[in-house]
Curated annotation (Swiss-Prot):
Enzyme Commission number(s) from the entry: 7.1.2.2
Protein name (record): ATP synthase subunit alpha, chloroplastic
Compartment(s): Plastid, Chloroplast thylakoid membrane
Primary localisation category: plastid
Role played: Produces ATP from ADP in the presence of a proton gradient across the membrane. The alpha chain is a regulatory subunit.
Pfam families in the cross-refs: ATP-synt_ab (PF00006), ATP-synt_ab_C (PF00306), ATP-synt_ab_N (PF02874)
Binding site for ATP: G170, D171, R172, Q173, T174, G175, K176, T177
Catalytic activity: ATP + H2O + 4 H(+)(in) = ADP + phosphate + 5 H(+)(out)
Quaternary structure note: F-type ATPases have 2 components, CF(1) - the catalytic core - and CF(0) - the membrane proton channel. CF(1) has five subunits: alpha(3), beta(3), gamma(1), delta(1), epsilon(1). CF(0) has four main subunits: a, b, b' and c.
Intrachain disulfide bonds: none
A biological process from GO: proton motive force-driven ATP synthesis
């Protein structure tokens, strides 16, 4: 039998002692006392922050929202069907954050930034907090660059600038999503990153929007964040903040971004559901008292950054649904007071066949003509006033038996202007064509046509102008001004088209 020498034993013991590494891990652990309806109550989590992420034994995550003396109220980021009473919960020590990178462009993701389009994982090396502080006053500069929507009614009378927050408000089925998606389609070639956030919508509706983006080639510069109607309330509540974090990533990289929240009414309802289940005291319309803060901290993140920060921008178009046109309800008034203007879509106009169904009279942009190119200011300056006067005169004409010639001419001009503003869906117009269209209407060139002929005439005029007078588009796009030369070219094209059109009608 071999004998071990003392010095060998000594050497082995020394090596083992040197290799010994005593690590003490401290974990903040609690126990589930109650779970159900997307809410869990936990005891034992003594040191936990508001908004901290927690992890349950079976893998589900949650966010600590209620910190009470006896327990902690957690909202679950999943169905939580496998969570058992008495199981352990671990505090992570982190606030909710998501990975961010250029690789998200062209993808459909959920509120946790996980892909749901079946095209594999997204590789990202950086991450951002879902809730970040908004840029301060010194970090911002005033809005001065236009963000073209491609819709004549908006770009001419309710202009939107890069860094602005413009609310789209109206009843259900009035074309709110169509206005937002057309704006995204119009950003093609404009170097604008778009983020479309779908909150609590039907999966079929979201699929339809994504299909439109693919067909029109818009998906290459767009990210879709989607939480469907069957998603947990927590994820519907988080989805807009996830979208904002992605848009901010590009904004701070000196890029221009556009974010659509479709729609914030459903986010507020998800937050109300969570709050009531957490036994928080309800206020007006059963919403929690801080529902204003829910939306203000989200929308204040939209900004036009100053030159020191790279002049990036984040333009927000939140959508809010009204009931029977009631804009004085709690959520609509809250969001109206936060945003820099609103585009009001009317069910009556929609049903009358005027689409987009924008009520120009009560829609407003608080940035105004600062967000328009000079050419648009020159031709569209009085169009909003003319349309408002037309609406007033039309209401009066219903009761008046006989109108003087001036009033009749004003009514005729107004009807043609309203016809001029009609546009089919997924057909945004470049600003040069908009300038030509508005000039034709406001200068009286459509007065000799029947109302039914206006759309056909304008379509042919735009094509004729593009084919025979390409200099017109070059002048507007390069100088951003409606010069005398541009006006002469446009007048020639209109006269030529009027002659051609009258010959067509005769034959």
């Amino acid at each position: 039998m071999a004998t071990l020498r003392v010095d060998e034993i000594n050497k082995i013991l020394r090596e083992r002692i040197e290799q010994y590494n005593r690590k003490v891990g401290i974990e903040n652990i609690g126990r589930v006392v109650q779970v159900g309806d997307g809410i869990a109550r936990i005891i034992g989590l003594g040191e936990i922050m508001s908004g901290e992420l927690v992890e349950f034994a079976e893998g589900t995550r949650g966010i600590a929202l209620n910190l009470e003396s006896k327990n902690v109220g957690i909202v679950l980021m999943g169905d939580g069907l496998m969570i058992q009473e008495g199981s352990f919960v671990k505090a992570t020590g982190r606030i909710a954050q998501i990975p961010v990178s250029e690789a998200y462009l062209g993808r459909v993701i959920n509120a946790l930034a996980k892909p749901i389009d079946g095209r594999g994982e997204i590789v990202a090396s950086e991450s951002r907090l879902i809730e970040s502080p908004a840029p301060g006053i010194i970090s911002r500069r005033s809005v001065y660059e236009p963000l073209q929507t491609g819709l004549i009614a908006i770009d001419s009378m309710i202009p939107i600038g890069r860094g602005q927050r413009e609310l789209i408000i109206g009843d259900r089925q009035t074309g709110k999503t169509a206005v937002a998606t057309d704006t995204i389609l119009n950003q093609k070639g404009q170097d604008v990153i778009c983020v479309y956030v779908a909150i609590g919508q039907r999966a079929s509706s979201v699929a339809q929007v994504v299909t439109t983006f693919h067909e029109e080639g818009a998906m290459e510069y767009t990210i879709v964040v989607a939480e469907m109607a069957d998603s947990p309330a927590t994820l519907q509540y988080l989805a807009p903040y996830t979208g904002a974090a992605l848009a901010e990533y590009f904004m701070y990289r000196e890029r221009h971004t556009l974010i659509i929240y479709d729609d914030l009414s459903k986010q507020a309802q998800a937050y109300r559901q969570m709050s009531l289940l957490l036994r928080r005291p309800p206020g007006r319309e059963a919403y929690l008292g801080d529902v204003f803060y829910l939306h203000s901290r989200l929308l204040e993140r939209a900004a036009k950054l100053n030159s020191l920060l790279g002049e990036g921008s984040m333009t927000a178009l939140p959508i809010v649904e009204t009931q029977s046109g009631d804009v004085s309800a709690y959520i609509p008034t809250n969001v109206i007071s936060i945003t820099d203007g609103q585009i009001f879509l009317s069910a009556d106009l929609f049903n009358a066949g005027i689409r987009p169904a924008i009520n120009v009279g009560i829609s407003v942009s608080r940035v105004g003509s600062a967000a328009q190119i000079k050419a648009m200011k020159q031709v569209a300056g009085k169009s909003k006033l003319e349309l408002a006067q037309f609406a007033e005169l039309q209401a009066f004409a219903q009761f008046a038996s006989a109108l003087d010639k001036t009033s009749q001419n004003q009514l005729a001009r107004g009807r043609r202007l309203r016809e001029l503003l009609k546009q089919s869906q997924s057909n945004p117009l470049p600003v040069e064509e908009q300038v030509a269209t508005i000039y034709t209407g406001t200068r009286g060139y459509l007065d000799s046509l029947e109302i039914e002929q206006v759309k056909k005439f304008l379509d042919e005029l735009r094509k004729h102008l593009k084919d025979t007078k390409p200099q017109f588009q070059e002048i507007i796009s390069s100088s951003k001004t409606f010069t005398e030369q541009a006006e002469t070219l446009l007048k020639e094209a209109i006269q030529e088209q009027l002659e051609r059109f009258s010959l067509q009608e005769q034959t």
